[in-house]
Amino acid sequence: MAKNNTNRHYSLRKLKKGTASVAVALSVIGAGLVVNTNEVSARVFPRGTVENPDKARELLNKYDVENSMLQANNDKLTTENNNLTDQNKNLTTENKNLTDQNKNLTTENKNLTDQNKNLTTENKELKAEENRLTTENKGLTKKLSEAEEEAANKERENKEAIGTLKKTLDETVKDKIAKEQESKETIGTLKKTLDETVKDKIAKEQESKETIGTLKKTLDETVKDKIAKEQESKETIGTLKKILDETVKDKIAREQKSKQDIGALKQELAKKDEGNKVSEASRKGLRRDLDASREAKKQVEKDLANLTAELDKVKEEKQISDASRQGLRRDLDASREAKKQVEKALEEANSKLAALEKLNKELEESKKLTEKEKAELQAKLEAEAKALKEQLAKQAEELAKLRAGKASDSQTPDAKPGNKVVPGKGQAPQAGTKPNQNKAPMKETKRQLPSTGETANPFFTAAALTVMATAGVAAVVKRKEEN
C-alpha cells in the first residue's frame, strides 16, 4: 500500500494563497487535496497514503505558529501606520501654525512700513517748517538790526543838531550881548513884542512853557540888568531884540521841530523797542520752537533710526521666515511624498492583511475539516500503525535501492493541481521512499513564503516601505530642527 505513493509529488509553488499548508497537512495525514483555480476540494486517497500522525501534528503546529507570526506582524504594521498618521497630522498642524505666524509677521511688517512712511512725511514737514522759521527769523533779525541802526543814526543826528543849535545859540547870545549895548532904545518895543510873542507862543505851545518862562525871566532880568547897566546901548538892544526875536522864533521853531522830531523819534524808538521786544520775544519763541523742533527732529531721527533698525530686523525675520517657509515647503513636500509612500505601504499592508485574514479563515476552515476527519482517521491510523511497524523491516532492506533512485525521482515533472496523480506509473512503488520524498519539498519551502509559495524577497515589502517612510519623516524632522 505504501508503494502506491511513490510518484505523488505536490507543487507548493502552484497552489493558491493559503492552500499550500492545508494541502501538505492533509496529504501527510492521508486526506488528498485536489486544488482547482477557484475552489479547494478534498479527496480521500487510499489507505496506503497514511503517514506518521506525529509528523502531521508537527506540521499543523508549525502552520499555527506561522499564522500567529503573520498576525503579530500585521498588528505591528497597523501600529506603525497609526504612528505615521499621527506624525503626519502633527506636521500638518505645525505647518499651519508657521503659516499663520508668517502672515502675522507680514502684517506687522506692513504696519511698520506705513508708520515709517508717516514718520518720514512728518519729518519732511518739520524740516520745511524749520526752514521757514529760520528764514523768517533771519528776516526779523535783519529788520531789527536795520531799525537799531536807523535809531542810532537818528539819535546821532539829533545829538549833532542839538550841539549845533547850542553852539549857534551861544554864538548868537554872545553876538546879541555885544550888540545889546547899542539897542537900548528898542528894549521897550522888544519887551512888548517879546511879551506878545511869549504869550502867543505860550498859547500855541503848551509843551514849551517852562523853557519860554525861563527864557522870559532870563530875558527880563537881562533887559533890566542891561537897562540898569547900559543906558547907552538902546539902539544895540533894539537890534539885539530884533535879532533875539528872530533867533527866539527860529530857536522855538527849531525846538518845536526838534521836539516833534524827538517825539516822533521817541515814538518810533518806542515802536522799535516794542518791535524789538516783540521780535525778541518772537525770536525767543522761535528759538524755543527751533530748539523744540531740533529736539523733535532728533527724536524723530532717533525714532526713524529705531524704526529703520526694526524694519531691518523685520526684513531679516521675514527673510528667515521666507527661508523657513521654503524649508517648510520642502519638508511638506517630503512629508507628502513620505505620506504617499506610507499610504502605498499601508495599501500593500492592508492587501497582505486581507490575504492573511483570508488565509487565516481558510486555515480555520481546514482545521475544522481536519479535526472532523482526524477523529475518523485516528482509528484507521491506530489500526494501520501496526501494519506499518511490520513493514519497517521490509523497508529497511529496500532503503539502499531507494537512495540510488532518489535522483531520478527528483527529476519527475510536478503534478498539476487540477490533474489526478495515478499511482503505479513511472518508477516501481517502494515503501521506503516516502520519508526521502518529503524532505526535498521541505528544503524548497525554506526559500519560499509560507503562505503563497512565492520566492521570498527581502526588499520592497510592506515592512521595508514602512521603514523607508519612517526614515523619510525622521529626515524631515531633522531638517526642520536645523532650520
UniProtKB/Swiss-Prot annotation:
Residues 157-269 are annotated as: 4.5 X 25 AA tandem repeats of E-[NS]-K-E-[TA]-I-G-T-L-K-K-[TI]-L-D-E-T-V-K-D-K-I-A-[KR]-E-Q. It holds the Pfam family Gram_pos_anchor. Residues 453-483 form a propeptide. Mediates the attachment of S.pyogenes to skin epithelial cells through the binding of the human membrane cofactor protein CD46. Also binds to the factor H and factor H-like protein 1. These interactions could contribute to the fact that the M6 protein protects the bacterium from the phagocytosis by regulating the complement activation on the bacterial surface. Its main location: secreted. Residues 54-171, 280-408 form a coiled coil. GO terms for cellular component: extracellular region. Residues 279-347 are annotated as: Binding to CD46. Residues 1-42 form the signal peptide. It is a peptidoglycan-anchor. Residues 88-113 have a biased composition (Low complexity). The lineage of its organism: Bacteria, Bacillati, Bacillota, Bacilli, Lactobacillales. Residues 122-135, 143-157, 268-298, 328-345 have a biased composition (Basic and acidic residues). The keyword Repeat applies. The keyword Secreted applies. It is found in: Secreted, Cell wall. The modification Pentaglycyl murein peptidoglycan amidated threonine is found at T452. This is M protein, serotype 6. Keywords: Cell wall, Coiled coil, Peptidoglycan-anchor, Phagocytosis, Repeat, Secreted, Signal, Virulence. Residues 74-157, 255-298, 314-345, 400-455 are annotated as: Disordered. A motif (LPXTG sorting signal) lies at residues 449-453. D repeats lie at residues 379-384, 385-390, 393-398, 400-405. Residues 279-347 are annotated as: Two directly repeated 27 amino acid blocks separated by 15 amino acids.
